[in-house]
Structures are given as structure tokens and as C-alpha cells.
């Protein structure tokens, strides 16, 4: 299965894929379109896209109102005080991806409580980690009760989050660690996927599923990927 990560998951619905909506915060953070236009740049130095979207979004109430429990909603928790409020708002059967990989987040303040989102009513309760996540931290997330992992988000730089092939060496190490140590974990491998070749790299490391996002910036490359991978289910 191919997952389409935000922001493209908000707009695309394609057979043989699952779109992840978001990321949503407790309160609205306006200015998404302008932030994309102002900060999205291609880096020829790193061969990838850099953005500083900064979690601009219409807020979790919008997601709850507009998406059913078949969707996967990505949430970002900015501080520990938001956790009980989000738990109260979000339906227990709404599928979630908890994004703990953005530099905006007070990670140390929230990670001791994020396991509260796990319950038997959710088919998906994924934790999305940074490329710089340590194996020790992955072990802690597993100990908290997480069994679904998304490796990984963009690489943090001074100019924003870097996507593209630079992520692959980091993500594959995380995928391999999880599948070697915790065979029952479900792992989505993502970052730098453009062709079947990258799919095979992640699959060799043990990834169960795969994710794309910035590939969608390239209509021609995305169409080729769709024709050769997504449409025939070649993954």
C-alpha cells in the first residue's frame, strides 16, 4: 500500500493509495497557502525540496467535521496541555497519525502522554518520527504501546524541512531497526521515493508500506510512478 502524506494527502484520492490528511493542531494556524508560496524552494545543493510550512492548518475541528473514521488524520501536539483537549475532541474511532517529528513541537513535554491516543477502536494510530530519531527513542515508543510507525518526516535544516533522497539513509536505518527488533510492528517507509527502485530499497529493509509526498510536485515523475507502481499495485 502507498500512503500519500500531507499536504498532498489533503487533495489526492487515488486507487491503491491511502491519503493522510493534515497535519492538524488543536487551534487553527492560518496562512497555509502563503507560507507554501513564500518558503517552498528546491535545493540543488541537497537535491530536494525545502519548506517552512510551520503547521499552518484550519485546526482539528475542521478535520473532525470534514473527514470520517475511514480517513487517517495527522495531528501535531504543540505542548502537553493540548493532549487532554485533543483526546476529548477527537472521536475514539478516528484513525490518527501522531506527528512528533516537527521542530515546532515541545517533544520532551508531550511524549510521555501520547500513548493515551492508542485504543482498540482505531485501525491506525501511527507515530511519525524524524529522520534523526534514535533507535533508543523508537524502543521507547514501542514500550509506550505504539505498533505502527512512519519513518520518516523531513530533515530539519536552518531553512526548513528538507525532503528527497537525503532522507533515505536515515529512514532505512529506522525501518530496519524496528523490523529486526519488533517483527510485529507495522512500518511505513518514506522519504525520497520516486521510482520502484526506492520502493525496493525500503522493502529490503523490512518496510510493510510506503509513503510519498513531494514526488507530487513533479507531475511528470508522479504520472510515471502512478503508471508503473500505483496503478498496477507494483509494491
What is the predicted function of each stretch?
Residues 1-4, 69-74, 121-133, 178-190:
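Short beta-strand/loop segments at the ligand-binding rim of alpha/beta enzyme cores
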Residues 1-71, 76-78:
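N-terminal capping/small domains of soluble enzymes
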Residues 13-15, 83-90, 132-144, 176-182, ...:
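Catalytic cores of alpha/beta
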Residues 21-29, 96-102, 148-158, 193, ...:
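Glycine-rich phosphate-binding active-site loops on the catalytic face of alpha/beta enzymes
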Residues 35-54, 104-116, 158-169:
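Glycine-rich tight-turn/loop motif centered on a GG-T
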Residues 64-68, 115-122, 142, 175-183, ...:
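Surface-exposed amphipathic alpha-helices with a cationic face
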Residues 80-112:
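Hydrophobic alpha-helical segments and helix pairs
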Residues 100-110, 131, 136-185, 219-225:
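Glycine/Thr-rich beta-alpha phosphate-binding loop at enzyme active sites
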Amino acid at each position: 500500500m502507498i500512503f500519500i502524506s500531507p499536504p498532498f494527502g489533503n487533495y489526492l484520492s487515488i486507487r491503491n493509495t491511502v491519503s493522510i490528511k493534515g497535519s492538524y493542531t488543536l487551534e487553527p494556524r492560518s496562512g497555509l497557502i502563503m507560507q507554501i508560496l513564500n518558503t517552498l524552494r528546491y535545493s540543488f545543493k541537497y537535491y530536494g525540496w525545502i519548506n517552512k510550512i510551520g503547521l499552518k492548518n484550519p485546526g482539528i475541528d475542521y478535520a473532525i467535521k470534514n473527514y470520517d473514521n475511514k480517513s487517517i488524520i495527522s495531528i501535531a501536539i504543540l505542548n502537553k496541555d493540548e493532549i487532554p483537549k485533543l483526546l476529548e475532541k477527537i472521536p475514539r474511532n478516528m484513525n490518527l497519525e501522531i506527528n512528533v517529528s516537527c521542530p515546532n513541537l515541545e517533544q520532551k513535554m508531550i511524549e510521555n502522554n501520547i500513548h493515551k491516543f492508542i485504543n482498540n477502536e482505531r485501525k491506525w494510530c501511527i507515530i511519525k518520527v524524524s529522520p534523526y530519531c534514535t533507535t533508543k527513542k523508537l524502543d521507547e515508543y514501542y514500550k509506550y504501546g505504539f505498533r505502527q510507525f512512519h519513518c520518516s518526516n523531513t530533515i530539519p535544516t536552518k531553512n526548513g524541512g528538507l525532503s528527497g533522497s537525503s532522507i533515505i539513509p536515515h529512514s532505512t536505518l529506522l525501518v530496519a531497526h524496528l523490523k529486526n527488533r519488533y517483527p510485529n510492528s507495522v512500518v511505513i517507509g518514506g522519504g525520497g521515493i520516486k521510482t520502484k527502485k526506492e520502493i525496493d530499497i525500503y522493502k529490503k529493509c523490512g518496510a510493510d508500506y510506503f509513503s510519498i509526498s513531494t514526488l507530487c510536485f513533479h507531475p511528470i515523475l508522479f504520472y510515471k510512478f502512478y503508471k508503473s507502481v500505483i496503478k498496477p499495485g507494483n509494491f
